[in-house]
Amino acid sequence: MLFNSIDFLIFFPAVLLVYFIVPHRIRPTWLLLSSYYFYMSWNPVHGILLLAVTAVTYLGARLLQRMDCEQGKKKRNKKIILVAEVIAVIGMLGYFKYTGFFLDSINVVLAKFRIAPVEIEWNIALPIGISFYTLTALGYLIDVYRGKSEAEHNFLRYALFVSFFPQILSGPIERSTNLLRQLRDSSIKRNWNTERIASGFITMLWGFFLKLVIADRIAVIADTTFGRPECYGTFGLMLGAVSYGIQIYCDFSSYSLIALGAAKTLGFDLINNFETPYFAQSVTEFWHRWHISLSTWLRDYVYISMGGNRCSKWHQYWNILVTFMVSGLWHGANWTFLIWGALHGVYQILEKELRPVVRKINGYCHTKTASFGYRF
């Protein structure tokens, strides 16, 4: 069920009401059951995949914490286990999300050499939310490996962390240091708090407004313009580009706001995902404000893992480029998104090289590059 559906408008108040009626010790179980019901309402079979990702990372984290990091051999074994776990989770994501893209790319290359294409009909549906909850689980696993988080012993609590229904479909991508820590803190008694619940509902209402009143309405302009671009002049195409920029922001941020508001009514604080990104003064700052949970995830687990800025300048630039290419592939399984990610990586590299010039023209530059990048 979508947030902006009648089903959710029935589901959420029922979950909230029962949550505050049942005893505190029952509430996590109730939220877990509600989260799986919410997720499996799309496709019950996909619940098995969610459970598999949860089980693999839960067991992997427990095993990682048992190992002694002081001894060299144990440290090597620990790294091997981490790599195996990461490959297993990415393999599940890749099978559903990237197999079709991989086969199509192979066939394009084969066609260049006039070789018969690989004839495999690929029509497996992509499990909704898989791009989000796999990153949540992988982030937790890597945090345990790095010693930044304790492995969770309670499987049901960890399963709730991965599947928490407000954020499983569209984020924010949660961290063990935030949401799991809140789930672990038994000292917090989440009793009915009218002020907090009212604040959560107001946040949700603002999200619904952005989605239903702005995003869905302005999408008509963007879709019409780019559906038949040959029918429009320069002004019409510029209006379409601006409309698309507004649409994608309002559409995506609306889901994050609804998630934040829903979690808040239940007594949880999720990561804020957007901080007025179109007011950023540079491309780098834009990505510090746009889809913050993804940007920080890629920074912490991809960019830093490759060496981050603790290496030569050109190695650092390579790390930036690869990180944004990964971001592009995460957003969509096709060459357009891959190039889109590389394009934003190049923007950041050029900004670093031309920082003195960029500071003078950032008011013009960041708007144009962001608009062009999204349309591309």
Residue ranges and their predicted role:
Residues 1-376:
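Membrane-embedded transmembrane alpha-helical bundles that form the catalytic cores
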